[in-house]
Amino acid sequence: MLPPHRRIGVRFANGGKALKRIDLNVDIGEGFPFDRELLKFATSANIGLGEHAGSRELTTETVAYCREAGLRVGAHPGYPHRASMGRDPIPEGEHKVYFDSIFVQCQWFAAMYAPDYLKPHGGFYNDTAVVLPEGWRTENDAPTPYGQEGIFLSKHPGVQFLMMLLRVYKLPLMGLDRTSHAEVARRAGKGFIKEGFADRLYRDNGTLMPRDRPGAVIKDPDRVAEQVRRLAPKVDSICLHGDGPDCLQFAERVRKTLEDAGYEVGA
């Protein structure tokens, strides 16, 4: 069970006024040097599973100190492509190899560590956070092969694969609202944690700007703080990246921005 200060909920102050609680999640266990220091600011940890970066030994070590610190722990599987750190799309004809790797990653991690949720990494995140076609149905029944949903899923096999993972491992999904992430989480029935990114530029359709585009990663701390204030009313969790030289400065700024705005930071 999570310690009392980490549990999901709200507290009341100022004569019974509820303060919204917002989680700060961080991607760690990927071999970068700031993981332990980031835990001072984060309340959830997305732990790499050793294929896009890091190793199983590093994953095991990371889980141990995150649990000790009282953080909520998420499985963070990624494509087994170390050269891009799992950020590139799946190469043509390699879907089965990549999906098999992710399934094995999740199988091992779920059996060993009982994660609290799942958050895809990098290319797996982007490939499964797809804007739904107009008129998408919201019933719980399975999509028909030749209906709108069936055609959509055939074009985006990662979305269907992600839904299968959530059902098999019975986990909530942390992901991008107003995309297929929200829909697969709803269909899997275990919950959805709406996520915003403090340091990433968004496209007009609400998805993330690809990292190779100019300005896709926000490096100005004032702009990061401004984005956090804009996102906070709309999301349940804000992501802090731990792979940049200024990540600790940004993490401290994000947490202070939320607390100064009256939010309670916690999972």
Question: Model regions: which residues?
Answer:
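Acidic (Asp/Glu)-rich catalytic clusters
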Residues: 36-42, 61-74
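C-terminal helical cap(s) of enzyme catalytic domains, especially alpha/beta-barrels
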Residues: 247-265
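Hydrophobic faces of well-ordered beta-strands that scaffold small-molecule active sites
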Residues: 22-26, 45-47, 73-77, 116-120, ...
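Catalytic beta/alpha-barrel core
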Residues: 47-52, 147-155, 170-178
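Glycine/small-residue-rich loop that forms an oxyanion/phosphate-binding "nest" at active or ligand-binding sites
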Residues: 82-117
